[in-house]
């Protein structure tokens, strides 16, 4: 029996107090949630402290909360901020645990089968288990997730029912406990004690839960009774303290008992027979042979080991679901009355909508050619309407909400005032004729004031030509193109802030992490060319890049005024008017945001130096030298992941793959 602690409130800790229009935004959001409003939008301008407002709302409504971001980097940033705001509550992180993932696929045109290949990040796997176990044990939980949270995860009921509950004085034999641990996919390993393992020393069993990374538990027996349970340091075995109740959740999210397993296998066999009959009737003998061989091997593994590679493809049978029925996901681990917050909703909701179709197209090919049973199609992400069915109450958070969010609710709460008093920038529209010389003059003014400039173009050629021109004119400039790796990108932004160069040119400067307070000018070339980067939403996002500096200014170079330009200019002017009135009424003098220029953490410096060296000469390395380089990078990748610098870890992974392909 799991004792769920449901009486612990969220406790927000911060040296800040709500300011600007944060108080009214917080009050409105809380009142609407408590009044039963299903959906609302927090329309927060760049730099207004949306995460702090979200934290205040969570602490006041006191509901388990799922925060969804559109990529791992943003999720990691939010996770770090929420951990600081709620040190006494359970703040969890749930993203895809793959450092590298090549999904199973088949290309009929070349008769190429691509086997699933992946590298699981142990640290993220631990955090995923920590998230699900926290949700089943307590209510004061915030889970920060990527869209990975809408993918199949296994039944929360089976996961909870399989948990092993232990207390001092409980009558249970040591061997019974060992059998129970094996049933929930723990492995016995008396030598290499790590997550998901247990070891036995006489009447003492030590267990390392899948949700922990440093602390394990020691269960001491006296005959067929538990004498004592202690929390211990996994490395030294040193006792930290005694515990009066220990719940051990399964070491995998896909778990089932023996009786249920046999029922599942019977269903798999029945589906196999049906599909084989179909293939044979169509004369697809190769596909039939392939499917029989693969599926019978998986069935044997399930019988003997309780697990097989690709077990998730049989999740419909394991969960007892009907064909087409949505899979269990992280959302099913939450209680009914939970709150969802969608960060950067204009991006995230588009991702949620698009996940299902791409997944189905790939899997249908595997089914058609005998690599998987049709039930594999039900191991999938949720459709958007299925996601909506899980929504009890939701807050969409964005500076530029999308059409979908606007169609879901008329309740829009604005957060326009920045705590620093900063205004949205002034905007000029200038003709494209003579734009190079005009822009050069503007850049020189900024250089004289030790300020920086962003320039955004629409094409790679324009960016390259402009970079060459400015260099000829003596401007210190860099072009950030799509081929630049994330690690280099971080270094480029840092160098821009330090004044190593003064102008950064790019095609898409909307990506996260491009907020630079030193930037006082944003120049938008071809502003009148309608499209993704020049629609109203894209323009407002780009304009926001100049909103961190008191002298922020935007120049749009265009030969005509498009509807998108006009709407973006009008919206910026409206916000600016509100901000000026507020500052005047409260005697606030705008100040440029003070943001430390952090030295890259030691691992980043080391890794970057290593990468630069290897990028210069790894082609001339011997195979042995390359192997040493790969080993060093793998270690650094793990260290980066442990520091939750998953962006850096991903770059390490990509370089490792490049090096491996050379041998």
Swiss-Prot record:
All copies of domain Helicase C-terminal, residue ranges: 435-601
Motif Beta-hairpin positions after renumbering to this chain: 97-120
GO terms of molecular function: ATP binding; ATP hydrolysis activity; DNA binding; excinuclease ABC activity; helicase activity
Keywords: ATP-binding, Cytoplasm, DNA damage, DNA excision, DNA repair, Excision nuclease, Helicase, Hydrolase, Nucleotide-binding, SOS response
Positions of the Helicase ATP-binding domain: 31-271
Biased composition (Basic and acidic residues): 1-10
Location relative to the cell: Cytoplasm
Residues where ATP binds: 44-51
Chain intervals for the UniProt region annotation (Disordered): 1-23
Every UVR domain range: 627-662
GO BP: any one term: SOS response
Main location: cytoplasm
Entry GO terms, CC: cytoplasm; excinuclease repair complex
Function noted in UniProt: The UvrABC repair system catalyzes the recognition and processing of DNA lesions. A damage recognition complex composed of 2 UvrA and 2 UvrB subunits scans DNA for abnormalities. Upon binding of the UvrA(2)B(2) complex to a putative damaged site, the DNA wraps around one UvrB monomer. DNA wrap is dependent on ATP binding by UvrB and probably causes local melting of the DNA helix, facilitating insertion of UvrB beta-hairpin between the DNA strands. Then UvrB probes one DNA strand for the presence of a lesion.
Assembly and interaction partners: Forms a heterotetramer with UvrA during the search for lesions. Interacts with UvrC in an incision complex.
Written domain comment of the UniProt record: The beta-hairpin motif is involved in DNA binding.
Family: Belongs to the UvrB family.
NCBIfam families assigned to the protein according to its UniProt record, in alphabetical order: PRK05298.1, uvrb
Protein name, UniProt field: UvrABC system protein B
Organism: Streptococcus pyogenes serotype M12 (strain MGAS2096)
